[in-house]
Amino acid sequence: MDESLTPNPKQKPASTTTRIQAPTSPFFLGSNDDRLEREQARAARAAASRRRSVIFARGSQPETESDPCFDKQQILELFQNCIKLASENKINQKNTWELNLIDHLCEIIKVEDENNTETNFQKASCTLEAGVKIYSMRVDSVHSEAYKVLGGITRAGHDDGGDHEDAAGAVENATNQKKQPEKKISPLSTLEPSFDALNVKKFDVAFAVDPLYHQTSAQFDEGGAKGLLLNNLGVYGGCQVLFDSQEIPGKLVSSANKHDKSETIDLSFVKECVEQMVLNMRKKDEIVPSLRAIINQFDEENQRPSDTFSCGQQTTESFDISHGNDASYADDDEGYENFGTSFDYEGQSGDVDENFGPNEAEPIYSNFHEEVEPASLQDMDSDDRLENVDDYLFLSLGISSKQNSWAGPDHWKYRKTKGPDVQPASEIKSSPPAKKTRKKKQAEPELDFAKALEEEMPDIFAPPKNPKTLLLPASRTPCQTKLPEDCHYQPENLIKLFLLPNVMCLGRRRRKNSGETSRQQPDDYEHGESWGNDNVYDDDDGPFDDNENDQSDAEDTNTLISQPRQVNKIDVQYDKASKQVDVQVLKETLWECLQESHQPPIQDEEHQQEPPESRSFKVLLASFPDDCQAAERTQDISPHLCFICLLHLANEHNLSLIGSQNLDDLTIHLA
């Protein structure tokens, strides 16, 4: 056996050649000698390893290599490991080259006992299946590694393709030139510039391009008003819209302020337009012209008393201001130039340019006074300038502190303002004196200490009826023992405009005249005067500066819009209870009334020319039978139900309905 395993063929050439020869008989083929083939394979591997060690040895004797062949115990462990990995499906491309099961299939499948000539096919099938899995994984590993290399070569070729083509053309065209060296691929072409690029997801990359577009498209798919563009765009500076998600409002505002410069605009070209507007103001100031007749029908008692006087009345009291202002006015020859050009007509205010001269302004207002009713100006004697704005602000809000408006727990208590309670003298005399009610004194409780000893003391150490009562709650709600955070909120913000923080909406105090009761306003504060009377507050020493009429109507800090016209409530008589009416019976009753004999001729001039086959709806309702079965009572049948039934009859029997000019009757013509 040892001689057959020797790797040197020179010692025993005869024995080796005799074993390698094929059988000489061409007719009979014996069984294949597996043992001989294994011995030959082992000898060849040993010789090859020995030759390899001799060639690569450098000045020293080759080391004694261990026998690469596994013994029986190692082969058994390899078989068990491969079968376990195959059953658990853990054979992959990483460990497939470490499993040498394919090289030892013969040793595993061979017959263990010499006396047993049968082969274990179950063991052979499991071994073959594990070998197939190992081989397939090796094929996949070779395929993937090869394509990785090809992919790297292709990518490098695309990057440097243009450079190589130019270099090749230069070599072919140029003579006696050296071959250009090939460029090396830079490792930076295969590396990412930052770690964020490696961690980012495809979903985030898609939104990083244009997040506003993705958000808008997602909301648009939902339907409704959420997908509208203005609902998704940001707004800054009042009404400026941010169309780009990368825009910064601060930079846009700063750039816009650089271009904004105060320039003087010449408004002389609108002189004729303003004159025409003033002339046509009476024609266009009515929203619903059809309601003019209804308003004129109101009684004089229902109309509000006028607090104004006519512009045509030349009164010296209208422009007499004696409330601390020393403003002087010029003669009447200057027209309306000095005291302001604004006027108030029926609760509407308008302005005229002050650049119009005195001679140009007079004919405009005189024509307007001749064509329409005289305009009205509010009585300036009934109003006063702003007084003690701080007192009005804090007292009206129920706050007593003016510094920080923070007084601990008392800060949340609302205190009523002390307003002047004015009662007429007649009511004070007629009302009887109120009787003072005395409070009953409560009896002081007496403590009986002897009675407490007679009572049985509870057993505090007794076990509880329910043991769960001794358990503490798992989570307790935190106790609110701290005062709220002081936001330092200023009460002035309540009366400031949101878009115009410098403008404060304040009322004006009204000075009461002696001997007159204030029937025009229910409280001590009334709304602003006409927009033109700015001279009243020129010398005011209040906390606010004079605006000198440099703002528009919408930004005036000294005036408010006048109170709208109030109309008394009109009681409308309508049914307040539900009624049951049989419409079919009502239609039959109306049709029977229409088919009766012709009605007598009407002496009224409006119905004198009616044809004989016509009926009056008013007369029809007057002659309605009392025994109608359409409702329990005849009063339950209303005219509008009869009119609805009449419309049905007109469609069914081809009737024609004609109304009257006064809208108080309806004529029915039979077909």
Swiss-Prot record:
**Which GO CC annotations does the UniProt entry carry?**
condensed chromosome; condensin complex; cytoplasm
Listed Polar residues bias regions: 1-24
The family database entries (InterPro entries) matched by this protein are listed as:
Condensin_barren_su2
Q: Name one GO biological process term.
A: mitotic chromosome condensation
Subcellular localization, per the record? Cytoplasm; Chromosome
Q: Which domain of life is it from?
A: Eukaryota
The segments labelled Disordered in the record are 1-33, 404-444, 510-564
Report keywords, A-Z. Answer: Cell cycle, Cell division, Chromosome, Cytoplasm, DNA condensation, Mitosis
Q: Where is the composition biased (Acidic residues)?
A: 536-556
Expression sites by tissue = Mostly expressed in flower buds and flowers, and, to a lower extent, in roots, stems, leaves and seedlings.
* Major localization class: cytoplasm
The knockout note for this entry states: Embryo development arrested at the preglobular stage.
**Which positions does the motif Kleisin-gamma middle domain (GM domain) involved in chromosome-binding occupy?**
406-415
Database matches in Pfam families: Cnd2
Oligomer status and interactors: Component of the condensin complex.
| Biological role | Regulatory subunit of the condensin complex, a complex required for conversion of interphase chromatin into mitotic-like condense chromosomes. The condensin complex probably introduces positive supercoils into relaxed DNA in the presence of type I topoisomerases and converts nicked DNA into positive knotted forms in the presence of type II topoisomerases. Essential protein.
Family, as annotated: Belongs to the CND2 (condensin subunit 2) family.
Protein known as: Condensin complex subunit 2
Organism name: Arabidopsis thaliana
